[in-house]
Amino acid sequence: ILAATVLGAVSDFCGLRWDKLEIGRRTLVLEQLLTTGGGWQDQFGGITAGVKLLQTAKGFGQSPEVRWLPDTVFTDPAYKPCHLLYYTGITRTAKSILAEIVRRMFLNEHDELALVREMKEHGIQMYDTIQRADFQEMGRLVRQTWRQNQLLDAGTNPEAVRQLTTLIDDHCLGYKL
């Protein structure tokens, strides 16, 4: 997201008139050149406002379609106090995590590919649930996202995180790091 901010500033300063899609594309190229291993989700998600579903087609040319969602389940007075952002202070390097996930995909590991397909469908389910402003189902789906992330990357849930989530598990519909 920092790279997108810098490229946006360069565009403004130099009068290049790049739109958000172009800034996202250039950010993706920059991150690949820097070997950070980033994908398009963070770049395009960070430079397009609001709650949304981003989708792309297969292939190298990534031009995400943005489908905005209502923010009711986050801003409605009945639901707003139910959301908490908690900083654990635990840091991880995305580069090595992503490299391992991509390696397993290129090796055609069946479980990995099945999980990625399941996560894609899960994203559509979440989109539909937020469209309906179904807070209870959204919480259940967030919990499912957490389980999927742990299957995708075993390091998602270190002991320090497990200790925290054990304290709140009975009080939450879902949570995610």
Where are the model-predicted features located?
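Short alpha-helical patches at coil-to-helix transitions and adjacent helical residues
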Residues: 3-4, 20, 38, 47
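C-terminal nucleotide
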Residues: 13-17, 25-36, 43-176
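DPxDG-like acidic metal-binding loop motif
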Residues: 1-16
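Glycine- and acidic-rich phosphate- and metal-coordinating loops
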Residues: 1, 22-26
